[in-house]
C-alpha cells in the first residue's frame, strides 16, 4: 500500500465522519464525503462545488489521483461529476473539491458527510513528442469513430 500525505482541513473529518478508507480489500477507490456547512439541495441541471475537508500531496510524478463518481448516485439519482473526471496532479496540495451535477429531473439533497465521489490513485507515464514526417504503418491507420464496426 502506498503512503499518501494528507491534511485534514475540516475538523469534522476523522471525528464526526470517518477518514476516507477502502470499503473492502479489493476496493480501488477511497470514498470522499461532502463536508458542507448544511444539507444542500441540488436542483435538476444545477452544478455545485463541494468541499471534502481534505487535501493530499502525492509527491510522486509517477502517480496521479482521479476523482470519480459513485455508481449508485449516478444510476439511481442522476448525480454525476460536473467535470466527469477530476484529475489530481502529483504536485497539487490544495483541498480536494468535487463538482456535483444533477443531470436528473428531480431535486436531490446532498447531506452533510454523504459519500459523493471516490478517489483512485493511478500510474502516470510522462511522454515527450518525437516529431516525425510519417508513422510506421499499423493495421488501423487513421480510422476513427466507428471504424472498427457498428456493434
Swiss-Prot record:
Substrate binds at residues 70-72, 83, 87-89, 97. Keywords: Hydrolase, Magnesium, Metal-binding, Nucleotide metabolism. One of its GO terms (molecular function) is magnesium ion binding. InterPro entries: dUTPase, dUTPase-like, dUTPase-like_sf, dUTPase_trimeric. Pathway: Pyrimidine metabolism; dUMP biosynthesis; dUMP from dCTP (dUTP route): step 2/2. NCBIfam families: dut, PRK00601.1. This is Deoxyuridine 5'-triphosphate nucleotidohydrolase.
Amino acid at each position: 500500500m502506498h503512503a499518501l500525505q494528507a491534511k485534514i482541513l475540516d475538523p469534522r473529518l476523522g471525528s464526526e465522519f470517518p477518514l476516507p478508507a477502502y470499503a473492502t480489500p479489493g476496493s480501488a477507490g477511497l470514498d470522499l464525503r461532502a463536508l458542507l456547512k448544511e444539507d444542500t439541495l441540488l436542483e435538476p441541471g444545477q452544478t455545485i462545488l463541494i468541499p471534502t475537508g481534505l487535501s493530499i500531496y502525492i509527491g510522486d510524478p509517477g502517480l496521479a489521483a482521479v476523482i470519480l463518481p459513485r455508481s449508485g448516485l449516478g444510476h439511481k439519482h442522476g448525480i454525476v461529476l460536473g467535470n466527469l473526471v477530476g484529475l489530481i496532479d502529483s504536485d497539487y496540495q490544495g483541498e480536494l473539491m468535487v463538482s456535483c451535477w444533477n443531470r436528473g429531473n428531480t431535486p436531490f439533497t446532498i447531506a452533510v458527510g454523504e459519500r459523493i465521489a471516490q478517489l483512485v490513485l493511478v500510474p502516470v507515464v510522462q511522454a515527450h513528442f518525437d516529431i516525425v514526417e510519417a508513422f510506421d504503418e499499423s493495421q488501423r491507420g487513421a480510422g476513427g469513430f466507428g471504424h472498427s464496426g457498428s456493434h
